[in-house]
Amino acid sequence: MVCLIAALLLFVGVQTTYAVIPELMGPLQSLIALLPQLLVVAAVGVGAVFSVRGWRTRIAAWRVYLSAHRTGSVVGVLVVGGIVASTVLLLDGRDVPGGTGRLRPGQDAPPLSADSWSTFRGDMARSGNPLDAEGPQVASTPVELGKEALRQAELYSSPSVVGDRLYVSSSGGSTFQAFGLIHCIDATDGAPLWSFKTAYKGFSSPVLAGGRVYIGEGLHHHTDARLYCLDAGTGDFVWDFQTRSHVESTPTVVNGRVIFGAGDDGVYCLDAGSGAEIWHAEGLHVDLSPSVVADTVLVGTGYGEMGVYVLDLETGDVLWSLPTEYGVWGSPSVQAGKAYFGLGNGDFARSDPEPYGALLCVDLATREQAWIYETKDAVLTAPAVVGNDVYFGSRDWHLYALNATDGTFRWRYDAGAPVLASPAVAQGIVYTASEDGEVAAIDRVTGEPRWQVYLTDAGYPQLRVLASPAIRGGQLFIGASEAGMFVIGDPGST
């Protein structure tokens, strides 16, 4: 039995845990996190039980026993050896990052263009509606992209697409060897170009800026996760920055600075070139992706003193805050002096026993709530604001459209499953995806579907969609956990 347990711990992967906001941490993960301390306590206990005086007598007795029980002794040595090896792997986990780049050293990064989808939500404003974004107008069969690198991977990260390259992170490994991988693949044929291994699984999405890739690592139970900066052309390591928590947040890069949430370690602002710390706002638990408006940083908190917080871009000081009754999970979108945040109970894995959700609109001039629209379950998505309309998804299985000025209802679309992906908008269409793999193009005005396709038709009935779609050049790119990366539409088919 002991051998069986040891083998399972060594070779069976962790049950998929969407340990993102709020905290989801299984008993086994808790035990693993405490393993170094437990080993120390065990060592002290052994030392207390066995006095120095009795060691010689016991060693002699052990020799006699081992000679009489050779088979059992071998098994015992294997079990102990396995535990020791696993512990070494666990404690040495911080040393695993490294690149496997295939491009030539010095290969140029793809230039950013007007139609680039360079970060989560398409641009640093988290709009979901970049200026020249174009998505597919008609349905087509989803094509699996990057099978060699991404097939059946855990994909919580949303892709970025710049030029003919797609960037995304995946998670994998087993209980004692879980890790993350940052990928760059050819967006046309899925050929792997380079990958970079991180010590922990990740939920953060890649940001392309200045020829570099910025991305965080870690889920809720990690306490020393890092933000990485890589060369976008080669995948070579440039610098990293270690926090005292997890970096599920997708960073924002603006004016030579990288700003990101680090869970209960607050918000950091780093120099984008060197990774040097500029400021650190402590005392906040931030998992969403910050937005920068003029000389301020907008974030929300889901634990502790829940609410909306506005920080000074230069110093990180809290300028003002607006308390909320429920956790703020949806990354803010800003337009015309108003910021829109998703609120609620529940998380990416399940609904809360007492579900609640809402979209909150905050007037940045008056520092007060402009309006709030309640839903039947949590709003974990970032809204897309286009003109006088705001679009967002909810765990209550619906995509909503509201008047952005006063929050009045326009329409809602029944997606048939929780909507955990943030919508993208282009050319009169709202693109959305449900957790069970339906991808739909919804008419912005009527709320009626123009087309629907199902990722499960590709042969992955158990897939889950947590990541958000990226649109560019008449195509839609989206990842599904336990499946892979898919592309819908032909280039230029708008």
Predicted regions mapped to residue ranges:
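Structural recognition of the beta-propeller blade-terminating site
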Residues: 186, 231, 271, 312, ...
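Glycine-rich phosphate/oxyanion-binding loops and their immediately adjacent helices
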Residues: 169, 188, 273, 314, ...
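Repeat-blade elements of multi-bladed beta-propeller folds
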Residues: 90-92, 114-124, 152-182, 200-228, ...
